A protein has these predicted regions:
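A structural motif corresponding to the C-terminal end of an alpha-helix
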Residues: 1, 31-33, 97-101
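Short acidic, glycine-rich surface-loop motifs adjacent to enzyme active sites
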Residues: 1-16
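Active-site beta-loop-alpha junctions enriched in small/polar residues
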Residues: 8-12, 42, 67-69, 114
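Conserved beta-sheet core of the metallophosphoesterase superfamily
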Residues: 19-92
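A short C-terminal boundary segment appended to hydrolase-like catalytic domains
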Residues: 75-209
């Protein structure tokens, strides 16, 4: 099985996680959680690949905050906090794979930035949550029927979110891709070349016993 924790934490309107979030996340990683999904800050916060301090083979994918899905907070809640970020959200996806021995692994993750387009439609206030993928950027304006200003707001929103999660997302994706490649080689050998695994096990150094 795989374990996912969805947690309500962090300081509102801060685009960087606080130390308490980091401490809790590390503890959850050490306990064996595979994925941590955070919320509450009303802004997007970074992603991170956490390494267990008790199991050298275990790592945890963490996004500290997915921001706002639907928001009436436009340019900022006060002069203390940066404008625009409360309009942003993140569609966070995780892919799991189950193997023949019943074990489940996290095999991939991704983030699609979203922007809340609050506008007037026939005198009524309307909210549209717009998913923003870079490869379709040139279609945003036509697909979502945006004004030039709204299109620019979409671009700014995308840049804000990827500026926050991009580094951590890349680290997670790189590790998961490498782990999957190694894992599939292992399972292939398990199915078709079991003698190779037996040889490796025989040649592996014995564990040191302590009393």
């Amino acid at each position: 099985e795989a374990t996912v924790m969805y947690i309500h934490w962090g300081n509102e309107y801060e685009t960087v996680e606080n130390q308490r979030q980091r401490d809790i996340a590390q503890k959850l990683c050490d306990l064996g959680f595979d994925v941590i999904v955070g919320g509450h800050a009303h802004v997007v916060q970074p992603m991170a690949l956490l390494e267990s301090t008790v199991d050298p083979d275990h790592k945890t994918v963490c996004i500290y905050s997915m921001g706002n899905a639907v928001s009436n907070q436009r340019t900022g809640v006060s002069d203390q906090f940066p404008p625009g970020y409360t309009e942003d959200g993140a569609l966070f996806t995780v892919t799991f794979e189950k193997y023949s021995d019943g074990k489940v692994y996290v095999s991939g993750t991704d983030v699609v930035p979203t922007w809340v387009n609050m506008h007037s439609n026939k005198g009524a206030r309307e909210y549209n949550i717009l998913p923003l993928t870079k490869d379709t950027e040139q279609q945003w304006q036509a697909s979502y029927e945006l004004t030039d200003q709204q299109f620019k707001s979409c671009q700014k929103s995308y840049d804000r979110t990827m500026g926050i999660v991009g580094e951590g997302l890349e680290a997670c994706q790189t590790y998961l891709a490498q782990a999957k490649e190694a894992r599939e080689e292992y399972y292939y050998n398990l199915a078709y070349n079991p003698e190779l695994l037996e040889t490796e096990a025989t040649e592996a150094p014995a564990a040191e016993e302590t009393t």
